[in-house]
Amino acid sequence: MRAEDIASVLEIQSCCYDETKLESEQSFLAKLRASPTSCFVALVPDGLAGYLVAVPAEAGSPPPLNGPSYSVPLTANALYLHDLALHPAARGTGVAVALIEAYFQALKQLKVQFACLTAVNDSKSFWERYGFRAAVPTGSGAGHMETYGEEARYMSTPVNA
């Protein structure tokens, strides 16, 4: 992902989430700047088909939704998958699988202990197929969960070395 992709990312995001879950350009840019090697886009001839944003974090501590800034914690031991979204026309084409594979490759390169995410829009069972299990957020992360909505579920899985 590059800064030039953010306008298309925002368009895709608006197709996938209700207004309570939309993030600003500033929020996306903050995460991209914090971890450019773990933010990905899937390109097709017509433009962006989807994106995945992930940032190093502390396991159990998801960042708030639409945070205006992001700094990688010194004690980061997880790669937090913050957002995966596809253009509606790209669903069922393998784009999601390709983006998730890129995420798992980034996990290996960063040598973290956990993969984490917050499941929204009834996606818990989707993420369970990739080995994620419900977990309890801790510290400031517990308070951040309310920014994702009532149905949001924090999930985590250990990374095999």
Predicted feature residues:
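Conserved active-site alpha-helix within GNAT-family acetyltransferase domains
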Residues: 109, 121-147
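A short beta-loop-alpha structural element at the N-terminal edge
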Residues: 1-9
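Conserved acetyl-CoA-binding loop-helix of GNAT-fold acetyltransferases
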Residues: 86, 92-105
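Active-site rim helix/loop that mediates acceptor-substrate recognition in acyltransferases
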Residues: 18-49, 53-71
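Short hydrophobic/aromatic beta-strand or adjacent loop that forms the aromatic wall/cage
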Residues: 37, 149-156
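Conserved acyl-donor/pantetheine-binding loop and adjacent beta-alpha core of acyl/acetyltransferases
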Residues: 52-85, 91, 139-150
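Conserved GNAT acetyl-CoA-binding A-motif
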Residues: 100, 105-120
